[in-house]
Amino acid sequence: MTKLEICCYSVDCAQIAEKAGADRIELCCGQSEGGLTPSIGALMQARETVTIPVHPIVRPRGGDFCYSDNDFAIIKNDIARIRDMGFAGVVVGVLDIDGHIDMRRMREIMSVSGSLAVTFHRAFDMCQNPMIALQQLADLNVARILTSGQQQNAELGLALLKDLVAATQGQGPIIMAGAGVRLTNMQKFIDAGIRELHSSAGRTVPSTMKYRKAGVTMCADSDVDEFAHYCVDGEVVEAMKSLLVMGAPLPQSA
C-alpha cells in the first residue's frame, strides 16, 4: 500500500498528522524557506510525544544546496544529534557547484547517519541529470528520494516520476512524490506506481491573540499576516489516508 508522509512545521502539526493516520512525519521549521532544520527543543518534544516515525530535515539555511565548510559541519553535527536521539530517519541533500550530487560529502553524511534511513530531499530536483543522480544515490544506499520530477509541482513532473519508478524496478531508493500532492490529484501518483506520497495537507490557522498590534511586523515582507500560521489539516490527512487504505472515491471539487 502507498505510504503517506506529512510535512510538519511544528510538533503540534506532527501530533495532528499522527492522529489523522499519517504513516510518517517530515519535521521542519521555516516554511517560508521551504523547510529548515528544526530546533533542539522541537526535536526533543517530537521524540517524547510522537510515536510514528519522524524524519527531521537537516538544512541549515534557505537557498541552494551547495554548502560552505561551516554549513557542512553544521549538517553533520545535526545529523549526529538526530541519530543519537533515536529518530527513525533524516532528510538531507548536498550538491556541488555544477548541480551534481556531491558524492564526497554525501558519503560522509551516510557514514554519520549510521542506521538512520536517509531521504535525499528536493535538492534532487535541482540536479543536472536526474538519471545519473538516481544511480549515484542508489550507490550510496539512500533509502528514498523526495522529488517533484524536477518540475514546480509533482503533477507537472509526473512523466519523470514514472521514469524514475521504472528505472528502480523495485530496487534502490524509493521514489516519493512531493510538491503539490493533494487529495484531489493523489490518485494520479498511485496509478503511476509511486509507493510513497509527501504532502503538507495544510491550511492557514488564525492566531488566538485578541490584541493585535497594527503597523509592526517581524518579517521583512510587510504583507505577511503575522496573526496566522500554517498547520496540518487533520481532516485532509484522514481523507488522503482513507483513499490509500480503502480506495475511497475522490471528491468532485478541486
UniProtKB/Swiss-Prot annotation:
UniProt-listed Pfam families: CutC (PF03932)
Keyword Cytoplasm assigned: yes
Predominant location category: cytoplasm
Signal peptide: none
Keywords: Cytoplasm
Keyword Isomerase part of the UniProt annotation: no
InterPro entries for this protein: CutC-like (IPR005627), CutC-like_dom_sf (IPR036822)
Any one of the GO CC terms: cytoplasm
PANTHER family: COPPER HOMEOSTASIS PROTEIN CUTC, COPPER HOMEOSTASIS PROTEIN CUTC HOMOLOG
Matching HAMAP family: CutC
The name this protein goes by in its record: PF03932 family protein CutC
Upper lineage: Bacteria, Pseudomonadati, Pseudomonadota, Gammaproteobacteria, Enterobacterales
Gene name as annotated: cutC
